[in-house]
């Protein structure tokens, strides 16, 4: 037999990154996650809720948290992680995965991140890993997460003092935004979210920029109507970019304005010591 070289190509359909569509709901109502999710009444789709110690103690979360005795409510479970950037680690991500495994979750179930960018990023990353992919939803509780971090599918965690070094593009199937969470933020986190929103205005939206220019006093006073408008504009602007370039090969790279220097500064200062939007 003569020597031959043959090739075989395997053709793949586009891989669905968690969901084909992300539904974003904006609500001016007081957050009532018991009414939204009805813990213990999952309707056949179990939920793994993930939050942090700070969010879990908010007054608007008290009723929801109380439903989970010993971390479970019916077939649903609740995981409360440490708060802030120091806990944005692969160990925290694997803690979510481990709890879902121990509770017998399947690929048809759901992970729900309730918190700021750290919780949303880690919950989404854990969802992408669990059984090679489970759906996720987010309830962002910081302004930064509402205008940026929860939107667009970037998930991950820090690793060896490198910010967001490992992760996956895994968009949430639904994002529920309650701007009222903003009133519970410390000033530094509120300012951080405004910084991210201003960046979006500078890049893509003159109307958004004009809000910062003309309504600065209302923003500084956290006027609810003004903040609601800023959040909706940022979400819409980012959605348009992500629809064109989910995996950041082109136009989405513009959203990294300030991030190269900013991430380096955060790393040198010690992750968590400087707010991301600062």
Mark where each language-model region is:
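ATP/NTP phosphate-donor binding region
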Residues: 2-110
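A glycine/threonine-rich phosphate-anchoring loop and its flanking beta-alpha core
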Residues: 14-18, 125-217
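Glycine-rich beta-strand-to-loop/alpha-helix junction loops that act as flexible
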Residues: 82-84, 114-116, 257-258
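Phosphate-handling active-site elements
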Residues: 102-108, 131-139, 269-278
């Amino acid at each position: 037999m003569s020597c031959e070289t043959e090739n075989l190509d395997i053709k793949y359909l586009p891989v669905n990154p968690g969901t084909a569509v992300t539904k974003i709901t904006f609500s001016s109502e007081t957050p009532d996650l018991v009414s939204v999710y009805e813990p213990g009444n999952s309707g056949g789709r179990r939920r793994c809720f993930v939050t942090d110690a700070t969010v879990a103690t908010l007054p608007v979360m008290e009723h929801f948290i109380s439903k989970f005795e010993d971390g479970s409510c019916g077939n649903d479970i609740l995981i409360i992680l440490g708060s802030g950037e120091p806990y944005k680690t692969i160990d925290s991500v694997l803690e979510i995965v481990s709890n879902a495994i121990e509770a017998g979750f399947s690929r048809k179930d759901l992970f729900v991140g309730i918190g700021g960018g750290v919780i949303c990023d880690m919950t989404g990353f854990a969802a992408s890993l669990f059984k090679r992919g489970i759906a996720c939803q987010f309830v962002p509780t910081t302004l930064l997460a509402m205008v940026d971090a929860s939107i667009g599918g970037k998930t991950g965690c820090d690793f060896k003092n490198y910010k967001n070094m490992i992760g996956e593009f895994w968009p949430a199937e639904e994002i529920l935004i309650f701007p009222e969470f903003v009133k519970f933020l410390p000033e530094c986190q509120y300012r951080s979210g405004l910084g991210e929103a201003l960046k979006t205005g500078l890049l893509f939206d003159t109307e958004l920029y004009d809000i910062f220019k003309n309504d600065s006093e209302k923003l500084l006073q956290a006027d609810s109507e003004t903040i609601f408008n800023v959040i909706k504009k940022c979400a819409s602007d980012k959605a348009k970019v992500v629809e064109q370039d989910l995996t950041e090969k082109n136009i989405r790279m513009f959203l990294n304005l300030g991030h190269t220097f900013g991430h380096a500064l955060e790393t040198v200062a010690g992750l968590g010591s400087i707010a991301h939007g600062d």
